[in-house]
Every structure is written in C-alpha cells, then in structure tokens.
C-alpha cells in the first residue's frame, strides 16, 4: 500500500465479535491521512443505545471469560500476540497512514504491542491470593478477582500500542474491555479487536466504540462500567476523573508532561545527543513523556548544542511509508498551526531558533497538503518562557543552561507535571542521587524514551496516577476479596 491510496470501506465499531455500524449516533467525525491531508474515513460517533449494547455484550462475555483459569486466558493472549507478530506489516502500515509516524517507528510500536500481550499472558496464570493462619486453627485467605467491564480511552499518538497496554492486563485479570480510540485515529484498534476474536476470546469481550467527548461521557457514566483507563490531556483527564467519581469508579490517568532531560558535563556526549533527539523527536514530538526541557551544564553547552543542531538537521522528513523517512507529518492541521504558534511566541519572548520551526513542503505533489514541519531547536530559553512551561506536543526542543546539580534539580521540579525525567552522566552516584530527587514517575539514566513492558509507566502530580505495564498494573485491573474461615465455635459477646 502506498501513501494517498487508502480509503476506509468497513464499519469502524466492533461489537459481539464483528464490525458493526452503530445503532444510534452522537455526531459524525472525519479521519485524515496526515501525509496528504486526505479524508480517509467519515464515521458515526456512538450514541447511548450503541454504548449500552457494547456494555451489554461485554458483560455477557465477562461471565464466560472470568470463569476461565489463568492458564486458559494465558494461551489465548499468547495466540493473539502471535497473530500480531504475523500481521506486523499490515498493522504498522495502518498506523502510519492514520497517525503519520514513520513506518520504521510504527513497526517498533507493533513489536512493543505483542511483547505486552506476551508479558501479561505470563502473569495471567500466576495471579494468586494469600493464605493467613489465624489462632485456633482458623485461617483467612485472599482472592484476586477481576473488576468487570473496563473502559479504555486512547490517545492518537500511539493508537495500537495504547490499546494493547490497556487491554492486555485487563484481559489477563479476567475483565472485559470497551475501547474508545481518539476520533483522529480510529482505524488500527479494529485490527486488534479482530485479532482477539481470532485468538479465541468470547464475542463481546473486547468491543470498540467510536466517538468524541459525548461518547466518552456515556462510557464514563455508565452504571455497569467498573473502571476507566485514560491516556490524553490533563483537562480531559480531570473531566474523566470527575465523571468517574460520581459512580465511585477507579481510574488510571496517563496525562501530559513537560519533562526535564539533564545533561551533565561528564556525560558521554554522543549518547547524550542521541538521547536528546530520542527525547524530543519520536513520533514528530507528539509523545507525552518527551524530555523537552533539555538542561545542559554550561561547560559543554556550546559543543552539545552544535552537535544537536547538526543531527536534527539530518533527520529525513517526508512520506512516512518510505523506508528512509524518520519524521512524518503531524496529526492534523490545527495541531500543526498550534505548534508553529508556540515557536512564534518563543521567538517573541527572546528564544533563538537554531534550526527548523517552520513549515516543510515535500517535493512529492501528493504530499503538498500534508501537515509537515521541520524539527526545531531553541536556545536562549528561560524557565518562565511559554515554550519551557507548557506542553507543546510537537518537534520543539528547548535548551537551557545550568551550573550546579542542586540548581538544576530545583528547576527541573518546578513544574505542575511529573511524568518523566532523564539524566546523562558518567558519575553513577550522581545519577542515582539526582533521580531520587526528581519528581517524576518514569526516570531514565543514560537513555530516554525506552519502554520495556516489564517496567511500570506513569506519572506524578498533574501527569496522572495509576500505572501501565509491569506487574503492578495487575493491581489496577483487579480487586482483593478477603475470606475469614472459622474452624471452631463462634465466641459471642451476647
């Protein structure tokens, strides 16, 4: 498949083990191909009746799935992981067409996705409670039980991967899931739904409802939904938390960030430069945990900046389906204009643009309406600038200088966010000392933006709470029941 040729011809909701058109509507949306600006799908947003049917089907499937042993669930999840590996190219291509990221990156996302399913398949068979001995031969035990119907609400930057990160632990624990993707990227999650069905999950265990805010509200407020897991912006996360609170539903929130990347003078310069590029320009900079505040110790500021600019200017921009492309278009035109607006404000506030920050128009005629820009490096930045304080969510790196360790830690923590942070240094004592002081949920030492599924991922402060990935996530998709067993006679105070 080549850029500019794809068009959606099938329904985009998934319920009861098949693609379906929603039975009612709460509006319509259009999905675009960012590389060309073409509309590739016009679809109906799910209304209350459709949401009710999705929940109803999920409840029925939950009764079957939750009664299976952990090993039975394990085998089905392993089969789903195998099918994802088998269909890797198809999934990655769909992701690239709808999201705009390079096919090179999309393939990595698919690999992380099947690894996530394999990891939680392994944990499904090991879920267990505890036995506690009590006086007189009595005892107690705990059971770790599923929650019921869970809702996953995804973001548009990693559509397929996020759906796997949310559904794999949910299903491993015995839950059902209804997933609502971003209306910007409605396509690839349908492939995951089909894969789960092919692997052998009961019909209705993993349903997809399309829509925007109204559909999301219907899901969050539904009386039969047991949990919400959301990835997206802080304002939307706050609304979801408020809606869920009225129903006393637990939530996992993976929200925004303005993460610090600290480069000490004793770093390995080559690795630090590569780390800074990884921290700012993956998926066109549209990554919540990006280290966009790059603090560089003054002794190496000039050398580091020179090398970062040189490497940034070498990034190949263009058709995301071409093998040598490393940066594709941004998600849509309003977002592109928003990012360019941030660069404009940065210049007005005194920042200096060393490279990029402007529109990029590819030579290929079919790409001329795409949403491209050159990756941007800013210097002369101050902590009070808009580009340093607010999440930009685009390919814009802000470089700031610092003198001492104590100073940079204080400045790094001066933010309402707390998703991620990174440190580059050869001094291992300093590295551990600094990350212990950083107020962030995901910290990297001498690397950045790697995401092994074995490690928990999530934030501090306004970046959210709860975790995705790692063993601990099992606790967020299950509940603990305590059973007390009396082996003697009841001792009564009456």
Swiss-Prot record:
What's the protein called, per UniProt?
A: 4-trimethylaminobutyraldehyde dehydrogenase
Annotated localization: Cytoplasm, Cytosol; Cytoplasm
Q: Name one GO molecular function term.
A: aldehyde dehydrogenase (NAD+) activity
What organism is recorded for this protein?
Sus scrofa
Q: Where in the sequence is N6-acetyllysine found?
A: 30, 298, 303, 344
Q: Which positions, given as ranges, span the membrane?
A: none
Q: Where is this chain primarily localised?
A: cytoplasm
Please provide the record's keywords in A-Z order. Answer: Acetylation, Cytoplasm, NAD, Oxidoreductase
Q: What is its EC number?
A: 1.2.1.47, 1.2.1.3, 1.2.1.46, 1.2.1.19
**Catalysed reactions listed for this entry:** 4-(trimethylamino)butanal + NAD(+) + H2O = 4-(trimethylamino)butanoate + NADH + 2 H(+); an aldehyde + NAD(+) + H2O = a carboxylate + NADH + 2 H(+); 4-aminobutanal + NAD(+) + H2O = 4-aminobutanoate + NADH + 2 H(+); formaldehyde + NAD(+) + H2O = formate + NADH + 2 H(+)
Show the CDD domains listed in the entry: ALDH_F9_TMBADH (cd07090)
Gene coding for it: ALDH9A1
PTM sites of type N6-succinyllysine: 30, 59, 303
């Amino acid at each position: 498949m080549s850029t500019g040729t794809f068009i959606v011809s099938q329904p985009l909701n998934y319920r009861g083990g098949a693609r379906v058109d929603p039975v009612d509507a709460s509006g319509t949306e259009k999905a675009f191909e960012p590389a060309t600006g073409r509309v590739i799908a016009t679809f109906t947003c799910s209304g209350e009746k459709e949401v009710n049917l999705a929940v109803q089907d999920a409840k029925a499937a939950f009764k079957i799935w939750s009664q299976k042993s952990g090993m039975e669930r394990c085998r089905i999840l392993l089969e789903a992981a195998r099918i994802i590996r088998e269909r890797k190219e198809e999934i990655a291509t769909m992701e690239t067409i709808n999201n705009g990221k390079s096919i090179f990156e999309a393939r990595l996302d698919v690999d992380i996705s099947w690894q996530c399913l394999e990891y939680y398949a392994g944990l499904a068979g090991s879920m267990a409670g505890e036995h506690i001995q009590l006086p007189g031969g009595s005892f107690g035990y705990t059971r770790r039980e599923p929650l019921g119907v869970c809702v996953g609400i995804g973001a548009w930057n990693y559509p397929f991967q996020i759906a796997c990160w949310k559904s794999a632990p949910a299903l491993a624990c015995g839950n059902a899931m209804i997933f609502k993707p971003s209306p910007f990227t409605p396509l690839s999650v349908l492939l995951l739904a089909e894969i789960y069905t092919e692997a052998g999950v009961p019909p209705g265990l993993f349903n997809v409802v399309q829509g925007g805010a109204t559909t999301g509200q219907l899901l969050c407020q539904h009386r039969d939904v047991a949990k919400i897991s959301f990835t997206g912006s802080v304002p939307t996360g706050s609304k979801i938390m408020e809606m869920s609170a009225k129903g006393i539903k637990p939530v996992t929130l993976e929200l925004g960030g303005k993460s610090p990347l600290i480069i000490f003078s004793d770093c390995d310069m080559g690795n630090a430069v590569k780390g800074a590029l990884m921290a700012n320009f993956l998926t066109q900079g549209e990554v919540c945990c990006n280290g966009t505040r790059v603090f560089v110790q003054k002794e190496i500021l000039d050398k580091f900046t020179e090398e970062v600019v040189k490497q940034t200017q070498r990034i190949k921009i263009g058709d995301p389906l071409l093998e040598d492309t490393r940066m594709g278009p941004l998600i849509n035109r309003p977002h592109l204009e928003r990012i360019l607006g941030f660069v404009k404000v940065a210049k007005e506030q005194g920042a200096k643009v060393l490279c990029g920050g402007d529109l990029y128009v590819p030579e290929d005629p079919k790409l001329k309406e795409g949403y491209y820009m050159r990756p941007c490096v800013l210097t002369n930045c101050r902590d009070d600038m808009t580009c340093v304080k607010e999440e930009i969510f685009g390919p814009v790196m802000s470089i700031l200088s610092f003198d001492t360790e104590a100073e940079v830690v204080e400045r790094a923590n001066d933010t309402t966010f707390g998703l991620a942070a990174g440190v580059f240094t050869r001094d291992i004592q300093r590295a551990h000392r600094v990350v212990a002081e950083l107020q962030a949920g995901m910290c990297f030492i001498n690397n950045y933006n790697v995401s092994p599924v074995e490690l928990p991922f999530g934030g501090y402060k306004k970046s959210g709470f709860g975790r995705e990935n790692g063993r601990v996530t099992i606790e967020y998709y299950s509940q603990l029941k305590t059973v007390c067993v009396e082996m003697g006679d009841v001792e009564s105070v009456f």
